[in-house]
Swiss-Prot record:
Disulfide feature: none
Gene name in the database record: miaB
Name of this chain's protein: tRNA-2-methylthio-N(6)-dimethylallyladenosine synthase
Major subcellular site: cytoplasm
InterPro entries per the UniProt record, alphabetical: Elp3/MiaA/NifB-like_rSAM, Methylthiotransferase, Methylthiotransferase_CS, Methylthiotransferase_N, Methylthiotransferase_N_sf, MiaB_methiolase, rSAM, rSAM_horseshoe
Biological role: Catalyzes the methylthiolation of N6-(dimethylallyl)adenosine (i(6)A), leading to the formation of 2-methylthio-N6-(dimethylallyl)adenosine (ms(2)i(6)A) at position 37 in tRNAs that read codons beginning with uridine.
Organism: Dichelobacter nodosus (strain VCS1703A)
Signal peptide, first to last residue: none
């Protein structure tokens, strides 16, 4: 007789797409078997590890975590351990050979099959592996979306077809596949009806979105944004992550036509050196990247930009790195996600000679991050005295008499106000800037009929 599984614990590594996928894993298990999430592994009957293979250290973390969970399984033989995400897709059966305590291995495109895979593992008392790429099937089998707060991610596409020389995503998530236009709008409308005020359209290469409409025509991201903006209750729209070569003039024009599209853009550049960009197979030059930002800034002078940077790519010389620093100065980035190059097996870059010493890579990364932190602090200081629209999303961690929310450029703002403002927009005067947040004073708040109650 199979043990009834009641509780699940999930640990997530990596990008926002993985966070989105983890929320869907929890939803399918709850809908199919009534399995509910718990706060610690010790309480769980199912342990899930949603993995990332973008960097080597993230992959090493997977097997370290599985080693820690092995002792739990020895004490609770009925415990089911599952590994999902990009490491699962990349390694498949090898995960079970290296960690035989794992019962289920599933990829990003097969998470909707998780309940059946767990049942199969229980019946067979052996491992089950499903890392196939069934195209858009995943989205057709997911439960109805549920709002857990005033902001929500909506996945509009999967995979990537760019094949940058350093990246494993095309191999682990497959080629680009866009969700049908009406399906995306329906999910956004459902979330809006539940109190979601801000939608973040999500994809590995989101501005390559090409979704089929009901009449057979194809919609791009620019058109999708316009339609999402027309959904009642939606007050803000973001999208991530974009590729510069797909950033069309039509998408740039949405910053003029759609006020609900926030004045902040994350657009990964990776390097400020044309030579390194060519080695990365990024398909654009620095001047083209800057031209796109200039067009957007001409429409939205107050817009802020963030980016991704890879430091120490094979063959990077000091002048290449200096070109990156020059680009940072020219753009004045608000935030960065910056890392030392990590060799990924099977990618073209893994065969390139890497003569940059690790000490040099670390020193360059420290310089880059320090400069962008200075820029971020400068932008925060410049916001003092300004009035900002803040989407209130929770009580402040410091006081129950204060609430916390985010500005369009993702600054956390704490200010005195009642909890009934959660889920509403508030105009706040910024009174002080700190390292990780801003302080403000409430000027006015959006009027809504009733406070929103979110289900978590």
């Amino acid at each position: 007789m199979q043990t009834v599984l009641k509780h699940v614990y999930i640990e997530t590594y990596g990008c926002q797409m993985n966070e989105y996928d983890s929320s869907k894993m929890l939803a399918v298990l709850k809908n199919s078997h009534g399995i509910t999430p718990v706060a610690t592994p010790e309480e769980a009957d199912v342990l899930l590890l949603n993995t990332c293979s973008v960097r080597e250290k993230a992959q090493e973390k997977v097997f370290s975590q599985l080693g820690r969970w092995k002792s739990l399984k020895e004490r609770k033989p009925h415990l089911i351990i599952g590994v999902g995400g990009c490491v699962a897709s990349q390694e498949g059966e090898m995960i079970r050979r290296r960690a035989p305590e794992v019962d289920v291995v599933f990829g990003p495109q097969t998470l909707h099959r998780l309940p059946n895979l767990i049942e199969e593992a229980q019946r067979s008392r052996g491992g089950v592996v499903d890392v196939s790429f069934p195209e858009i099937e995943k989205f057709d089998h997911l439960p109805e979306p549920r709002a857990e707060g005033p902001t929500a991610y909506v996945s509009v596409m999967e995979g990537c077809s760019k094949y940058c020389t350093y990246c494993v995503v095309p191999y682990t998530r497959g080629a680009e596949i866009s969700r049908p236009f009406d399906d995306v709008l329906a999910e956004c409308a459902t979330l809006a009806a539940q109190g979601v005020r801000e939608i973040n359209l999500l994809g590995q290469n989101v501005n390559a979105y090409r979704g089929a409409m009901h009449d057979g025509t194809i919609a791009d991201l620019a058109l999708l944004i316009e339609y999402v903006a027309a959904i009642p209750n939606i007050g803000r729209i973001r999208f991530t992550t974009s590729h510069p070569s797909e950033f069309s003039d039509a998408l740039i024009e949405t910053y003029r036509r759609v006020p609900k599209l926030v004045s902040h853009l994350h657009l990964p550049v990776q390097s400020g050196s044309n030579r390194i960009l060519a080695l990365m197979k990024r398909d654009y030059k620095v001047a083209e990247y800057q031209e796109k930002l200039a067009k957007i800034r001409a429409i939205r002078p107050d817009i802020s930009f963030s980016s991704d940077f890879i430091v120490g790519f094979p063959g990077e010389e000091e002048e290449d790195f200096q070109a990156t620093m020059d680009l940072i100065e020219a753009v004045f980035f608000d935030t960065s996600y910056s890392f030392i190059y990590s060799q990924r097996p099977g990618t073209p870059a893994s065969t390139m000679p890497d003569r940059v010493p690790l000490t040099v890579k670390k020193e360059r990364l420290a310089r880059l991050q320090a400069r962008i932190l200075e820029m971020a602090a400068s932008i925060s200081e410049a916001m003092v005295g300004t009035e900002q629209w803040v989407l209130v999303d929770r009580l402040s961690r410091k006081s129950e008499r204060e609430v916390s929310g985010r500005t369009e450029n993702n600054r956390v703002v704490n200010f005195s106000a009642p909890a009934s403002l959660i889920g509403r927009f508030a105009k706040v005067q910024i009174t002080a800037a700190y390292k990780n947040s801003l302080r403000g004073r409430l000027i006015e708040a959006e009027l809504l009929p009733d406070p929103v109650v979110y289900t978590r």
